[in-house]
Every structure is written in structure tokens, then in C-alpha cells.
Amino acid sequence: MAADIRVFTCLSDNFGYLIHDPATGATASVDAPEAGPIVRQLEANGWTLTDILITHHHYDHVGGVAELKQRYGCRVIGPHDRKAAIADVDLRVAHGDVVKVGELLARVLETPGHTLDHVSYVFDADKAVFAADTLFSIGCGRVFEGTYPMMWDSLLKLRTLPDDFRLYCGHEYTASNVKFALTVDPDNEALKARAAEVTRLRAANQPTIPVLLGEEKQANVFLRADDPAIAVRLRMKGASAEEVFGELRERKNKS
């Protein structure tokens, strides 16, 4: 049976996600920014939390873990790196591992850059990827602990996923990402279409996520750092994809 995925807001701009397996009743939260909204969503749907899938150690992604584990006795799954940084982890995972949520299978991708321990969870059967703060819609995460080549390599891992997969990211940053992207890639028709959609969704107080990866591959300038046209726009003709990506990220940092 297909996963039932719910999207809601935690903190000010974090996305909360619940993934429910109708066949077994198992329910996972991807990260746990804070407990309250997750508990309310669980109660509204009559679900019990069985698992938390942690993507990285930043507090705005793990702040609710301890309270949820105490309340539900759920299993906490997290990246193998930085063992001391994430408390309450029961199962540590690495690239290529497969995690079961009931009968649902999540494949682990190591996607470092934003942090060194960052992982993404890919539900192949449900055509969904939870990329947290590595890949945003029309953007990507800041590179706090890794390097630009490392982050670019992580984006390439995500870019290889099929076009019909849906991206679920960590934050509602799409409107600001679109604003920046249009300064670099103003003639991109896919980007302009996404910009119009984002304006409509936000005006209706609706989330801009999920989004198809195929659309992101066309519209997200950070996924196109190896496109010679982007290098030309940045006056970096002949530069490597890693160099172009680094320049894009530096410009976004200052925007």
C-alpha cells in the first residue's frame, strides 16, 4: 500500500512530515523540530509514532526528539556520524542502508555539505525523497561544515533520482529562493512558471512542497551549476561545476 504523507509547519519555517504505512499502522516523523505540532498531527489522524528519521544534528531538526521518544517509545534513527551530537538515537545508518517503517522501505543517501552527518531518505516505491537541508525547492542549504565540492556531489546524488520523484525539503524557503534564482537565470521559463506557482501557493497560505524533481532539475539554478549557460551568466566561462556552485552559494549567502 502507498504511504500516506502529511506536511505541516513546525517552528517558524520548518516543514514537519509524517509518513504512515496503512498496512501496519507504523508512522515515522522525518526529523522532529518540535514535539507539539507532530503530536497534534498524530492525534488528528489517530496515528501512533513508531519511528523518527533524523537527517542531521541541527537543533531545529532534533529539538523534539527527546519528548517524542518519552511519549511514544518510538525508535530513533539517525546518521552514523557525530555519534555524540544526536542523543537518543537507537539505530545509526550510513549510505546504502535500508530502513523499514512498517512495510515501507527508506533508502539512505549520505548527502553531506550542509553538515558532515547529513543524510536523505529515499522512499523509492512511493517516489519520494526527504532531503532536509541539502536540497530546497529552487535552492540548497548553506554549507556550514562541508565544502562546496562536497555539497555539489550531494546535489548530484539527488539529481540522479527520477523526474517523477517528489522532493520534501526541510524549510519553506521557496519564495526567497525564487527571488535569488531570477537574478541569475531570468530567462528560464521553468523558473518563471515555478515563481508564479509559488506566488499563488503562498498567497493562499499553502506549502510549496512537495515538488517534482523533474521541475527542480529545470528550474533550480543550484542543480544546474554544470550548465555552461549558468557559468556564462556569472562571467565564469570555463569554470568547473564546483566553482560555479560555490559562486552561486556565496551570492545567495549575501542576498
UniProtKB/Swiss-Prot annotation:
Zn(2+) 2 binds at D60, H61, D133, H171. Its EC number is 3.1.2.6. GO terms for biological process: methylglyoxal catabolic process to D-lactate via S-lactoyl-glutathione. Binds 2 Zn(2+) ions per subunit. Zn(2+) 1 binds at H56, H58, H114, D133. Its cofactor is Zn(2+). GO terms for molecular function: hydroxyacylglutathione hydrolase activity; metal ion binding. Pathway: Secondary metabolite metabolism; methylglyoxal degradation; (R)-lactate from methylglyoxal: step 2/2. Keywords: Hydrolase, Metal-binding, Zinc. The keyword Zinc applies. The keyword Disulfide bond does not apply. InterPro entries: Clx_II_MBL, Glyoxalase_II_hydrolase, HAGH_C, Hydroxyacylglutathione_Hdrlase, Metallo-B-lactamas, RibonucZ/Hydroxyglut_hydro. Pfam families: HAGH_C (PF16123), Lactamase_B (PF00753). It catalyses: an S-(2-hydroxyacyl)glutathione + H2O = a 2-hydroxy carboxylate + glutathione + H(+). NCBIfam families: GSH_gloB. Thiolesterase that catalyzes the hydrolysis of S-D-lactoyl-glutathione to form glutathione and D-lactic acid. Belongs to the metallo-beta-lactamase superfamily. Glyoxalase II family. Monomer. This is Hydroxyacylglutathione hydrolase.
